[in-house]
Amino acid sequence: MLEHIMSMIIPVILILLVLAILAANIRVVPQSRAFVIERLGAFQGVWGVGLHFKIPFIERIAKNISLKEQVVDFPPQPVITKDNVTMQIDTVIYFQITDPKLYTYGVENPMSAIENLTATTLRNIIGDLELDQSLTSRDHINGQMRAILDEATDNWGIKVNRVELKNIMPPRDIQESMEKQMRACLLYTSDAADDL
């Protein structure tokens, strides 16, 4: 009798173990996400929204990627204008992952690569402008940066939707002289209005 019970327990345990392994490998990919799948270490495919089954011990989810637009605020970068004025510029990048495979395998650290590319692109663009131009040409700089970054990040599976210069900070002495000039203009304008 004991042998009969033992002979029944082992198959039941094995069946439960197999069912547990199978259940643990069923995956649901939610909306706005993609899973990059590797089989035995090689790229197998990209799973989109829905129910999927991962082959146990052979396949693995290499990366779980958000397909939503993402916003990255980079710290202020020191840049030098054409007239040799050093200032700090704070940038914000709005981007979206368009190709999960390229995003996973195209570059080692995508965020670091975007940050470095943003800094060098900003330095190149501002380096061609004088201080006055850089302070008054935000839309032009934003558009130029977006076009350059979008083209460069295509190989990484990334689309740059927008670039914004959040803050342009000239050196303290130049900022003070600009404020004095603005006050003088306002004073002159109010004096001229009083004379009328």
Q: What is each PLM-predicted segment?
A:
Residues M1-M182:
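N-terminal hydrophobic membrane-entry segments
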Residues Y188-L196:
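Single conserved hydrophobic/aromatic residue that forms the stacking wall/gate
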